[in-house]
Regions:
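Binuclear metal-ion centers of metallo-dependent hydrolases, dominated by the metallo-beta-lactamase
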Residues: 158-181
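Conserved AdoMet/S-adenosylmethionine-binding subsite of the radical SAM
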Residues: 20-155
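Short glycine-rich or small-residue beta-strand-to-loop segments that form or flank ligand, phosphate
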Residues: 11-16
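Conserved alpha-helical substructure of the radical SAM core
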Residues: 1-10, 24-27
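Residue-level signal for beta-strand positions within conserved beta-sheet cores that form or flank
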Residues: 7, 41-43, 175
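Conserved hydrophobic residues forming the short capping helix/wall of the S-adenosyl-L-methionine
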Residues: 1, 36, 166-169
Length: 181
């Protein structure tokens, strides 16, 4: 890409699995940044993360070393977050939220679904808005599922409802929010 002069905006850690689970994450971030400086000096280095490991010191250092941090939080309280996310293992909600509050300049991503689990109900949206206001991200990306999930009881949220959620968040908190569909 560098030899072909293809512009690169951001080199992003993401994929099938959670990148913060890698045992050598901190070293990988520093090596990718070194290579970025050499080949794509104007590109950012970022990560998409479910935030469950952000409390670990090495992970927190790696995340702070990045220019862009996309961190997920799909619920305004622990019960809804667990219902939507279905995390593996024992993830401590309060620890995860504290870590999100301590990370600088994050972009929060929140997925909304309807069906047996529905995090678009007015009461839950108010809880979520309060939480996002406490976390104080740079911005929020609101989205829904884009293909049929393994659990057929989850359904996508209409675009108009996502736009209402994003607008309400911005109006109440002043935090920019945009809908990805």
């Amino acid at each position: 890409m560098a030899t072909q002069h293809i512009p690169v905006d951001c080199i992003t850690f993401a994929g099938n699995g959670e990148p913060t689970l890698h045992p050598d994450l901190e070293e990988l971030v520093h090596e990718v940044k070194r290579l970025r400086h050499q080949y794509f000096p104007t590109a950012d280095v970022g990560m998409l993360s479910d935030a469950t490991q952000a409390h670990r010191p090495g992970v927190a250092r790696a995340l702070r070393a990045l220019e862009v941090r996309y961190m997920k939080c799909d619920g305004g309280d622990e019960a809804m977050w667990r219902a939507v996310t279905q995390p593996l293992g024992s993830v401590a909600w309060n620890t995860m939220i504290a870590a999100l509050k301590n990370l600088p300049d994050i972009i929060l991503q929140s997925m909304f679904i309807q069906g047996q689990v529905d995090n678009t109900q007015p009461g839950h949206i108010e809880t979520w808005i309060r939480l996002v206001g406490e976390i104080r991200p740079l911005s929020v990306q609101v989205y829904t599922i884009d293909r049929a999930p393994a659990d057929s009881r989850a359904h996508e949220v209409p675009l108009a409802r996502l736009q209402e959620i994003a607008a309400r968040l911005s109006q109440r908190t002043g935090i920019p929010a945009e809908v990805y569909d």
